[in-house]
Amino acid sequence: MAQLDREDYALSLVSMIRLCGAITGWLTLAFIAFVTLSPIQDRPSIANPQTEHFAAFAVMALGFALGYPRRTALIAIFIVCSAFTLEAMQLLTPDRHGRLLDAVVKMVGGLAGIGAGRLILLVLQSQFARLRSPAKHSPS
C-alpha cells in the first residue's frame, strides 16, 4: 500500500513538473518577445545585455525541457530559430538593432537550459527508479 502511495505521489509530481515547465517556457517566450521588440527605453535592465539574453533563454529552454521531455530535438531547433528570428525582427524597429552576437548568446543560453533540464530529468528518473525498486536490504 505504501509503495503505491509513493508511486502515485511520484506520478503527480512528474505531472506538476511538466505543467509548470511548459507554462514557464511559454510565458518566458512571450516575455522575451515583448522585451525584445519593445522600444529600448521600455526594456527592463537587470544585468549586462549578454547576461540577460543568456539567462532568459536558459530559463525558457529549461521550462520547455521539463515541460516536454520527449521533444528535446524539437526544443533545440525551436530555441535556435527563436534566437535568430527575434534578433532579425529587431531590425524592423527603428530604435533597436539585431546583432549576430546577441543571437549566438541567446542560442547558447537556450542550449544550456536544455542541458540543465535533461540533467534534472535524469536525476528525477534515478530517484523514481529507486522508489519503485524493492529495498535491497529486506528486514529478516
Give the label of every model feature segment:
Residues 2-103, 107, 111-140:
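Bulky hydrophobic segments
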